[in-house]
Design a protein with these regions (language model features):
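Active-site-proximal alpha-helix that buttresses catalytic centers in soluble enzyme cores
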Residues: 1-187
Length: 187
C-alpha cells in the first residue's frame, strides 16, 4: 500500500563521475582496508579507460526518473530519492534531505539485487548509520527484499540475454557482478 510511505529511496554503490573523482572514490571504497596504493592505481586505470566515469550514477538517475514517471502514471505521487554508499549523493546526505522535507517513512530499494554481506546486510548497516547520523528526525526505512531470484527479474534478464544473443550461432555466457584481480581469482 503506497499510502504507508512518504518516499522511495534507491540505494546504490556510487561511482566516480569525472577523472578527478576516481582516486577519492577508490579511497572511500577501500577506507579502513589497507589496500596498497599500487592496487588503487591499477583500479584507477580501469576507470581511465572509460574517461574516469562509472556508468552507475547515470543509470541510477535514469531509473529514478523512470520510476517516478511510472508511479505518477499509476496515480502514485511519491518522491523518489537516491543515496549511495560510496559517492555523491551519499546516503547520510540523502537521509538528512528527506528528514528536512518531513519524510517519515521510506521504502528502500537496494540496487544490488543479489544476497551477500556487501550487497544486502552492509546496505542495511549503511542505511541505519545514515539514520543515526540524522537523529530522531530520520525517516523509518523498510527495505525491499533482494530481487535476484524474483520471477519477473529473472524473466526480464533472460529476455535481455536472448535479445543480445540474436545472430550468434553459439555463445558461452559468464555471469559476473564485476571483475576481480587475477591474484584473487587464483586463490
Amino acid at each position: 500500500d503506497s499510502t504507508e510511505y512518504d518516499a522511495i529511496l534507491l540505494v546504490a554503490f556510487g561511482g566516480p563521475e569525472s577523472p578527478q573523482d576516481v582516486m577519492p572514490f577508490l579511497e572511500n571504497v577501500t577506507r579502513g582496508r589497507r589496500v596498497p596504493r599500487e592496487r588503487l592505481l591499477e583500479v584507477a586505470a580501469h576507470y581511465d579507460r572509460f574517461g574516469g566515469v562509472s556508468p552507475l550514477n547515470g543509470q541510477v538517475r535514469a531509473l529514478r526518473d523512470a520510476l517516478a514517471d511510472l508511479l505518477l502514471s499509476r496515480g502514485i505521487d511519491l518522491p523518489v530519492h537516491w543515496g549511495n554508499r560510496n559517492w555523491d549523493p551519499l546516503l547520510p546526505d540523502t537521509m538528512a534531505e528527506m528528514a528536512s522535507a518531513g519524510i517519515r517513512r521510506v521504502l528502500a530499494v537496494v540496487l544490488s539485487g543479489y544476497s551477500s554481506y556487501s550487497s544486502c546486510r552492509q546496505y542495511l548497516e549503511n542505511i541505519e548509520a545514515a539514520r543515526q547520523s540524522v537523529g530522531e528526525s530520520a525517516p523509518v526505512v523498510d527495505k525491499v527484499r533482494a530481487f535476484f531470484n524474483h520471477p519477473e527479474f529473472v524473466a526480464a534478464s533472460a529476455e535481455c540475454l536472448s535479445e543480445a544473443l540474436v545472430g550468434f550461432e553459439s555463445a558461452e555466457v559468464a555471469f559476473t557482478a564485476h571483475s576481480i584481480p587475477a591474484s584473487m581469482a587464483a586463490g
